Amino acid sequence: MSRRHSAEKRPTEPDPLYGSTVLSKFINKVMESGKKSTARRIVYNAIEKFSKRIKAENPLEAFEQALENAKPSLEVKSRRIGGATYQVPIEIPANRRSSMAMRWIIGHSRGKAGRSMEDALASELSDCYNNQGTTIKKKDDTHRMAEANKAYAHYKW
């Protein structure tokens, strides 16, 4: 890695169907082994099933709402001070929030055995939209952990 210049952040291309950069990032996270067309098909079919399940007029807005509900605002990071390690709560930057939410949704969808990825993803998105399910539980656990360690917030760096 060069010490002189940091890499330029390339703009994300919007997805072809909805024209959303957020959805494009989500598709890229679902993609495995470079199979983008397969990832697109899975995500588009999952969003279609999800929007029918919740009877949404605009599937993209419903998807973004589900993602918004899954975004954490606080997390804990380990900080070593004088031989002791403290879990210090910190606020999460916006790009990391959405990245974590996407990873959690996809991870919990992959963990649902015996279903197609489309069905599992649609189910997880509808759970997030309704503020329930494993992804929301993960977010609440993260917030609870940060709340429990609020006493160490002054160790922020």
UniProtKB/Swiss-Prot annotation:
Top-rank taxon, per record: Bacteria
GO molecular function: rRNA binding; structural constituent of ribosome; tRNA binding
An annotated GO cellular component: small ribosomal subunit
GO biological process: translation
Annotated source species: Protochlamydia amoebophila (strain UWE25)
Coiled coil: none
GN (gene name): rpsG
Function: One of the primary rRNA binding proteins, it binds directly to 16S rRNA where it nucleates assembly of the head domain of the 30S subunit. Is located at the subunit interface close to the decoding center, probably blocks exit of the E-site tRNA.
Record protein name field: Small ribosomal subunit protein uS7
